[in-house]
């Protein structure tokens, strides 16, 4: 078979005609050294601080240190495949993440890549991970309640939409349990809201430096209860590199801000910020930034303040949305005066202290009501809750003070004895099993029973049984009363008080 010269020339002409002239221009640099998740790169002269750069094999990094002769880049992934002399490209974009409704029900990493095996995330909207917090003018003071479903929190340490409330305690004191119960509690409210977005609350949970098994367990619980439908889980686990653990809270806040900025309401839980500070310290020391107190860098306060300031209640002109934050901090041996705990306490609008001592006494949630405080206070409570919850905090404070003295004296006068009896029953009443949040109306009725003397004749050991029976009685025979408290939100006096008293008297007659 002969070679067809005409055919070959035709093919060559065709190839030459269609030859693409467009050349891709990319600013590149070369890796000088790499190790411990940090790369030193030479040649990226115009790179911006916080810009995403790309290594061979699609591995991404972020430029953090801009020095005279090189750029310090933190690597979002394994640095094993990166070697000296590799080419690094600028992407010309600051680190951003996907946002939008498509993320609801998903588990993603700190860059928004899915981890749950449910396919890609169908959204075109993206947002920069580290954006500026809203200014003073767009904000409005916090006034709507954000119900946690926990009696001790909703009654004594109320949280409002747009507030930042710190959950602080040693390891194994139930910090995550409080946060998880808050997410589960929103299911009833979200289901009842229907299409009314102003009543719904979307939840974002950020796991920083936790075990993968712990995160998997949490996701399983959310799926079982159906709470995953209105939740996003962002996971940067203990096995992820430090830069991912540093970035995850910022990325998750951008996902939550999507709801805030569209006139909706969101809740974000950072579990926990101590581990984020540790990973930031690791990165800073490896980048040779000067260390400060406890070897943390000088800007570790700013690390947390710029993150938590993004949670806000926006005013009418800006869509009325809100973002509530529940940051979690783990203390060592109950030391709340360490560097990171004091920093975050000063940034937030209050804190819930959880104590090991109370936890082992069986008081769970182990909230120390004396040290816990909400700086928004009763402006974030419903009228009904406000009118019954006032006396509880005072009575428990008096009880704690008296209980300390009562250990020394045996002959106590009747008033002191009454105070101790009431306090013991209220303490018992504040206990609550995990995964069983209560509605606002149920908490109002239970606390009313506690403060108005309905428990005074009941042995302390039977308080839990009384409460269980009372809730079953209210849900079965007095659903109308619970609906009335929920919808009308009356002050508990006059007619409303009579209705609750009638229901409690009816139950008292059957309880034995």
Swiss-Prot record:
Sites where the protein binds ATP: 169-176
Enzyme class: translocase
EC number: 7.1.2.2
UniProt topology in membrane: Peripheral membrane protein
Annotated localization: Cell inner membrane
GO molecular function terms listed in the Swiss-Prot or TrEMBL record: ADP binding; ATP binding; proton-transporting ATP synthase activity, rotational mechanism
InterPro entries in UniProt: ATP_synth_asu-like_sf (IPR023366), ATP_synth_asu_C (IPR000793), ATP_synth_asu_C_sf (IPR038376), ATP_synth_F1_a_nt-bd_dom (IPR033732), ATP_synth_F1_asu (IPR005294), ATPase_a/bsu_AS (IPR020003), ATPase_F1/V1/A1_a/bsu_N (IPR004100), ATPase_F1/V1/A1_a/bsu_N_sf (IPR036121)
SUPFAM superfamilies given in the database record: C-terminal domain of alpha and beta subunits of F1 ATP synthase (SSF47917), N-terminal domain of alpha and beta subunits of F1 ATP synthase (SSF50615), P-loop containing nucleoside triphosphate hydrolases (SSF52540)
Sorted UniProt keywords: ATP synthesis, ATP-binding, Cell inner membrane, Cell membrane, CF(1), Hydrogen ion transport, Ion transport, Membrane, Nucleotide-binding, Translocase, Transport
Pfam families: ATP-synt_ab (PF00006), ATP-synt_ab_C (PF00306), ATP-synt_ab_N (PF02874)
Entry's Gene Ontology cellular component terms: plasma membrane; proton-transporting ATP synthase complex
Source organism, top-level taxon: Bacteria
Catalytic activity: ATP + H2O + 4 H(+)(in) = ADP + phosphate + 5 H(+)(out)
Entry annotated with the keyword Transit peptide: no
Residue numbers marked as site, Required for activity: 372
Matches recorded under PROSITE patterns: ATPASE_ALPHA_BETA
Summary of the function given for this chain in its UniProt record: Produces ATP from ADP in the presence of a proton gradient across the membrane. The alpha chain is a regulatory subunit.
PANTHER family: ATP SYNTHASE SUBUNIT ALPHA, MITOCHONDRIAL
Family: Belongs to the ATPase alpha/beta chains family.
Subunit (UniProt): F-type ATPases have 2 components, CF(1) - the catalytic core - and CF(0) - the membrane proton channel. CF(1) has five subunits: alpha(3), beta(3), gamma(1), delta(1), epsilon(1). CF(0) has four main subunits: a(1), b(1), b'(1) and c(9-12).
Name this polypeptide is given: ATP synthase subunit alpha 2
Organism, scientific name: Dinoroseobacter shibae (strain DSM 16493 / NCIMB 14021 / DFL 12)
Protein's gene: atpA2
């Amino acid at each position: 078979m002969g070679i067809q010269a005409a055919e070959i020339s035709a093919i060559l002409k065709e190839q030459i005609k269609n030859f693409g002239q467009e050349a891709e221009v990319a600013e590149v640099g070369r890796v000088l050294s790499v190790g411990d998740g940090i790369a030193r790169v030479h040649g990226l002269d115009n790179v911006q601080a916080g810009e995403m750069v790309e290594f061979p094999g699609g591995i991404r990094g972020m430029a953090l240190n801009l020095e005279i002769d090189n750029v310090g880049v933190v690597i979002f992934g394994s640095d094993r495949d990166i070697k000296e002399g590799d080419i690094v490209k600028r992407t010309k974009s600051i680190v951003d993440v996907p946002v939008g409704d498509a993320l609801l029900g998903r588990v993603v990493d700190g860059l928004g890549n899915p981890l749950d095996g449910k396919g890609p995330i169908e959204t075109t909207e993206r947002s920069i991970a580290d954006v500026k917090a809203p200014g003073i003018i767009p904000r409005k003071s916090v006034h709507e309640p954000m119900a946690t479903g926990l009696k001790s929190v909703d009654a004594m340490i109320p949280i409002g939409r747009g507030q930042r409330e710190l959950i602080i305690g040693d390891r194994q004191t139930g910090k995550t349990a409080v946060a998880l119960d808050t997410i589960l509690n929103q299911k009833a409210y979200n289901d009842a809201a229907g299409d009314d977005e102003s009543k719904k609350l979307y939840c974002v949970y950020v796991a920083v430096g936790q075990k993968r098994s712990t995160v998997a367990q949490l996701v399983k619980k959310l799926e079982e209860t159906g709470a995953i439908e209105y939740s996003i889980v962002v996971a940067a686990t203990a096995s992820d590199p430090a830069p991912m653990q540093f970035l995850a809270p910022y990325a998750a806040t951008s996902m939550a801000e999507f709801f805030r900025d569209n006139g909706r309401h969101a809740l974000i839980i950072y579990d926990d910020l101590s581990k984020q500070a540790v990973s930031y310290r690791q990165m800073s020391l490896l980048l040779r930034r000067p260390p400060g107190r406890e070897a943390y860098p000088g800007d570790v306060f700013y690390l947390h303040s710029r993150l938590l300031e993004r949670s806000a209640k926006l005013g009418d002109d800006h869509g009325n949305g809100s973002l509530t934050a529940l940051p979690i901090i783990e203390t060592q041996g109950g030391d709340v005066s360490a560097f990171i705990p004091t920093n975050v306490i000063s940034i937030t609008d209050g804190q819930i202290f959880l104590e090991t001592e109370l936890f082992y006494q069986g008081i769970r949630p182990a909230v120390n009501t004396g040290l816990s405080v909400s700086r928004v206070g009763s402006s974030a409570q419903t009228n009904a809750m406000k009118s019954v919850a006032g006396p509880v905090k005072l009575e428990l404070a008096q009880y704690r003070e008296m209980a300390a003295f009562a250990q020394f004296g045996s002959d106590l006068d009747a008033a002191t004895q009454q105070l101790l009896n009431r306090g013991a029953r209220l303490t018992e009443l504040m206990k609550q099993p995990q995964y069983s949040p209560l509605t606002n109306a149920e908490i109002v009725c239970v606390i009313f029973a506690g403060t108005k003397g309905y428990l005074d004749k009941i042995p302390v050991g039977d308080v839990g049984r009384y409460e269980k029976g009372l809730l079953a009685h209210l849900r079965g025979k007095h659903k109308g009363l619970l609906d009335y408290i929920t919808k009308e939100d009356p002050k508990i006096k006059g007619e409303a008080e009579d209705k609750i008293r009638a229901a409690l008297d009816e139950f008292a007659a059957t309880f034995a």
